[in-house]
Swiss-Prot record:
Biased composition (Basic and acidic residues): 52-62, 305-319
Provenance organism: Mus musculus (Mouse)
Protein name: tRNA methyltransferase 10 homolog A
Compositional bias ranges of the Basic residues kind: 63-75
Phosphoserine found at: 22
Lineage, highest ranks first: Eukaryota, Metazoa, Chordata, Craniata, Vertebrata
Enzyme Commission number(s) from the entry: 2.1.1.221
Pfam families: tRNA_m1G_MT (PF01746)
Gene: Trmt10a
Length: 328
């Protein structure tokens, strides 16, 4: 009788579950995403565990950024309370201006639809605002300004004509800055930027939705015979999403680096949390095949993604719809 019951008991789901976790084989158990999914390897499981740990620390990182903003705000108030009445000018005089030139190249105007032009406009607004409040503001250039971008700014942001501490030019950057001073920031460059030379002018491609024009900024840099480089993102960060940085991502990372002289701190202060960024030294080791499966290199162009919590009020487009916070 017992021999007849034995096959039925072996086929029981409960017994199968116990067998799968017995004899020290817990580590060999292969979790599945769903009933029809492929089994997950131990290495992939380890990566998922690392990511889970990173996600669990999300609030802690968010609080740290909030505390940093509060501390800076308190420092400004203390400066103002100790001033002689000319508070704002007093604070601005304490800023250590950088001689580094940061250029947004707007020569891709005819390659973008109006929706992307509006995104670029918002990113430029963010760059301007961040540079105005930075401890080490850069010499900000907006070149090849015209076409759809200028028209959109005229219609939706007429105050841009009164912007201060910015050079808005219709000329191409190659007509304004010496060739030997230029460095184009592009993900396709084989050169990795290790430090910033404040005598140089770093160019950011003002191109939204660059996936339709892959390698365009690199081709432009080589055609003009100027230096090119990419930020050392891969040395400090591993991301589980597309490695695409918006214009103001790049701009703000450079501002942060000028203040901290720490690339990793700059990346993790600026990069949006939803990109799943993890410090490179904390990410588990992966095989060359894993690297090949990662998304292709980041670029200074964007798809209108937003970064850290934006303290500024959201902008509205022509239809009166609230847009995402600006970044890049």
């Amino acid at each position: 009788m017992s021999s007849e019951m034995l096959p039925a008991s072996i086929e029981s789901p409960n017994v199968e579950e116990k067998l799968g976790t017995s004899d020290g084989e817990e580590e060999r158990q292969e979790p599945r995403v769903d009933a029809g999914a492929e089994p997950i390897s131990k290495r992939q499981l380890k990566k998922l565990m690392k990511q889970k740990q990173w996600e669990e620390q999300r609030e802690q990182r968010k609080e740290k950024r909030k505390e940093k903003r509060k501390r800076k705000k308190l420092e400004r108030r203390q400066l103002e309370s100790n001033s002689d009445g000319n508070d704002r000018k007093r604070v601005r005089r304490d800023v250590a201006r950088s001689s580094l030139r940061l250029v947004i190249d707007c020569s891709f105007d005819d390659l973008m639809v109006l929706k992307d032009i509006k995104k670029l406009h918002k990113q430029i607004q963010r760059c301007y605002a961040e540079n105005r409040r930075a401890s080490h503001p850069v010499q900000f250039y907006l070149t090849s300004h015209g076409g759809q971008l200028k028209k959109n700014m005229d219609e939706n942001d007429q105050g841009w004509v009164n912007w201060k501490d910015i050079h808005i030019k219709s000329e191409h950057y190659s007509e304004l800055i010496k060739k030997e001073d230029l460095v184009y920031l592009t993900s396709d460059s084989p050169n990795v930027l290790k430090d910033l030379d404040e005598s140089k002018a770093y160019v950011i491609g003002g191109l939204v939705d660059h996936s339709h024009h892959k390698g365009l900024t690199f081709k432009q840099a080589t055609s003009y015979g100027i230096e090119h480089a990419q930020l050392p993102l891969a040395d400090f960060v591993k991301m589980n999403s597309r490695k695409v940085l918006a214009v103001n991502h790049v701009f703000e990372i450079i501002l942060e680096f000028l203040e901290t002289r720490d690339w990793q701190e700059a990346f993790f202060t600026i990069l949006p949390q939803r990109k799943g960024a993890v410090p490179a030294h904390k990410a588990c080791e992966s095989s060359p095949q894993d690297h090949q499966s990662l998304p292709e290199g980041w670029d200074s162009a964007s798809e209108g993604e937003s970064c850290r919590d934006n303290p500024d009020s959201p902008q509205k487009d022509e239809q009166g719809q609230q847009s995402s916070p600006v970044l890049q």
